[in-house]
Amino acid sequence: MATITPVFKDGKRDNVTCYSPISKLSCVSKIFEHVIYKKLFFLTKSWISPNQHGFFSGRSTITNLTVFSEYCLSALEHGSQVEEVYTDFSKAFDKLSHTILFSKLQQFGFHSNFLKWIKSYLSNRVCKVVVEEFESRPYVQTSGVPQGSVLGPLFFNLFINDISLCFKNSKFLLYADDLKIYLRTDRVIAGLF
């Protein structure tokens, strides 16, 4: 059973949506996840978009910003500007559909026994929420990946990876569930300076 502790992000403390659910998992579970993670990451690292900078060794918020900054500087040097849109998928880790994840993993060609294990690992997860000395009744988590788990971020990256198919005429960068879509435009910007 996972114990979920709500961790405050920002906003009003009396608003439940301003908290992230962090799962406290058993040490045995985490050790097992580390073993699976090493193998799974080795098999999938070449599949994950180079535009995803979250939860990927050698990539970070810094590499994400560096790629974007270099693109912007190049545009400015050529007399252009860059239009961008920033998005953040609300509750992306909590709402991740297990059915869609299993389908995507199947498309990657994973062995059926491994897929059964992943399905077993994510399905019927019993959780309870603990806040100070108060604790909820146990409930079954029907979607999402456990935040605080070792495999959760990799599952999320594999889940969101095909978003790259949506951007044929623009650039994009991801940092986990934060998406930046951008494009160089050739508008005259001399009047701005």
Show where each model-derived region lies.
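Hydrophobic "anchor" residues on beta-strands that sit immediately upstream
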Residues: 84, 173-174
